[in-house]
Amino acid sequence: GPLGKLLKNKVENSVRHVFNFNNFRELEGPTIMPDKVWKASGHLGTFSDRIITCSKCNAVFRADKIVEEKFDVSADGFSDSKLLDFIREKKINCPSCSGRFIDKLERQSLMMKTKVAGQDASLRPETATVTYLPFIRMYQYFRKKLPFGVFQIGKAYRNEISPRQSVLRGREFTQAEGQLFIDPKEKDNWEKFDSVKEEKLPLWDYTLQDAGK
C-alpha cells in the first residue's frame, strides 16, 4: 500500500545516498534479455534449486530448506547424496501431509522464461549481469579512466519453488547491486583501499560450507 511504498522509497534512497557518497553512478538496465546472455553468464545451466516431491500429495519443496527448517544446519553446501541421506536418516516427511518424500532430487531452474520476437529469453534473476554488459559505454562516459563505480536498483525475478518467507524469498523483488571496475594491477593502490583494507568480513570458507556449518 501507500505507506509500504513510502518505506520502500526511503530504503532505496538510503542505498542511493551511500553509493552516491562514494562517487558511484546509477544506471538502469533491461529486465529481459535473450538466453544467449544468460548462457554466457552461466545462469541458464546452473542457476537452479534442488527440489524433492512428496509421494502422497505431490507437493514440491526445496530440499535444503526442508532440512534447515527442522534442524540447525546449513544444507545449501550439501552434495545431492548427502542431502538425500540426511532426509532419509532423519525421517523428514512432507510438511503438508506428513507423507514420505520420493527418494530422488530434481533440479528446477530459477530462470523466468519468455519469448521475444520468437527467440528464447529470460527475465533477469539479478541486476549484476546487465550492469556489466554496457561496460564500453560506461568506460567512455568515465573518460576511459579506471577505477569507476556504478550501481543499479531494480527488479529481479526468480522461479522460486515455494516462496514462504514473505519479501525475503519472493518471485519478484527489488535488488540493489554495485560494481567497481578497477585495473587488477592497481587494486592495492586504489585511493580508498587504505580505508577498508583492515576490515574483516565474516565469510565461510568452502570447508565450513561443505560441512554444513
Question: What is each stretch, according to the model?
Answer:
Residues 1-213:
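TRNA-recognition modules of translation machinery and tRNA-sensing kinases, especially anticodon-binding
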